[in-house]
Amino acid sequence: MDETGNPTIPPASNNTCYDSIDDFRNQVYSTLYSMISVVGFFGNGFVLYVLVKTYHEKSAFQVYMINLAVADLLCVCTLPLRVAYYVHKGIWLFGDFLCRLSTYALYVNLYCSIFFMTAMSFFRCVAIVFPVQNISLVTQKKARLVCIAIWMFVILTSSPFLMANTYKDEKNNTKCFEPPQDNQAKNYVLILHYVSLFIGFIIPFITIIVCYTMIIFTLLKSSMKKNLSSRKRAIGMIIVVTAAFLVSFMPYHIQRTIHLHFLHNKTKPCDSILRMQKSVVITLSLAASNCCFDPLLYFFSGGNFRRRLSTIRKYSLSSMTYIPKKKTSLPQKGKDICKE
C-alpha cells in the first residue's frame, strides 16, 4: 500500500521536493527499522522461548501470546530487507517475490497484532466481569480455535497486499514499497483501505474500549483486597494495549486515510507534499514498532513471569546435576483458568 508516501510527481517541476524527502526517508526508515528489528527479534524471541519451555503451564493467555510472538518474529525477519532498501537509497535488490512478501508480512503482523490483542482483551473482560461464564468460555481449546480463525482471516484478507510488486523508475532503478502509480490503482487502494480501516481498526478499537470500560467498572466495584494479582494483570493489559493502539495503530490509520485522499488531489503544493511524505515515514515506523509493544504485554500483564523463569532455571539445574529420583515439582494445572 502507501509505504513511502511519495506521490507521483512530474520530474521537471517537483524534483526538488522528491529529493529532499528521499534523504529524510532513507535515514529515518533505515535507522528505525534496524532498531525495531533488533528489539523485536530479541524481545519476542525471549518471550517465545519462555512460553515454549514452560508449555506444561498451559493457559488461554499463553496461547494468544505464542501466536502474537510468532507473528512479530515473522515480520521482524523481513525488516532487514527494508533496511537494505533504504540504505541503498531506494533501490531494491532482492527480486519481485521478496518485495511482495515484505509488504505482505508487515500488514499481516499489523492486523494479527490488532486482532490478537482484541481477543485477549475480550476474554480477559469475560474472566473478570462474568466469572461464571469464564469457566466454559476462556479455555485453551477455544483460544486455539480463535487464533486459527484470526490467522486464516488475516492471511486471506491481506492477500491484496501481495499485488505490491516492483517496478522500474525513470532511472531504471528497481523500486519497492511505493504508492500506486495510476488513478485506477489509487481507487482500488482507497477501497481496500476503508475495508481494512473499519474491520481491522475501528471495530477492534471500539471492542477494547467497551471491554476495558466494563473491566474498570467491575474492578472499582469489587473489594481492593480480592484478586490482587488478577487486578494487576488487567491493569497491565489495559495500559499496554491502549498504548499500542494510541502510539502504533491509530496514528498510522488516521494518516493513511488523509494520505490516500491527498494522492487524489490534482494540485499539490510542494510544502504540503513534504509534510505529507514525512508524516507517512513517521506513522509507518510507529506502526511497525508494534512488534516492540507485544513483549511488554506479556511482561506486564501475563502474570507469573518470574515463576516461569524459575521453572526454566530448575529444569536447567536438574539436567546439569543428574541427581536420580529427584523431580522438579511442576505447578498444578487448572486452578485458575485465566491465571495468565
Curated annotation (Swiss-Prot):
Residues 53-60, 131-144, 218-233, 301-340 are cytoplasmic. It is found in: Cell membrane. InterPro entries: CLT1_recept (IPR013310), Cyst_leuk_rcpt (IPR004071), GPCR_Rhodpsn (IPR000276), GPCR_Rhodpsn_7TM (IPR017452). It is a multi-pass membrane protein. Receptor for cysteinyl leukotrienes mediating bronchoconstriction of individuals with and without asthma. Stimulation by LTD4 results in the contraction and proliferation of smooth muscle, edema, eosinophil migration and damage to the mucus layer in the lung. This response is mediated via a G-protein that activates a phosphatidylinositol-calcium second messenger system. The chain crosses the membrane at residues 32-52, 61-81, 110-130, 145-165, 197-217, 234-254, 280-300. This is Cysteinyl leukotriene receptor 1. Glycans are attached at residues 14, 172, 265. GO terms for biological process: calcium ion transport; cell surface receptor signaling pathway; chemotaxis; establishment of localization in cell; inflammatory response to antigenic stimulus. Pfam families: 7tm_1. Residues 1-31, 82-109, 166-196, 255-279 are extracellular. Belongs to the G-protein coupled receptor 1 family. Disulfide bonds join 99-176. GO terms for cellular component: plasma membrane. Keywords: Cell membrane, Disulfide bond, G-protein coupled receptor, Glycoprotein, Membrane, Receptor, Transducer, Transmembrane, Transmembrane helix. The keyword Transmembrane applies. One of its GO terms (molecular function) is leukotriene receptor activity.
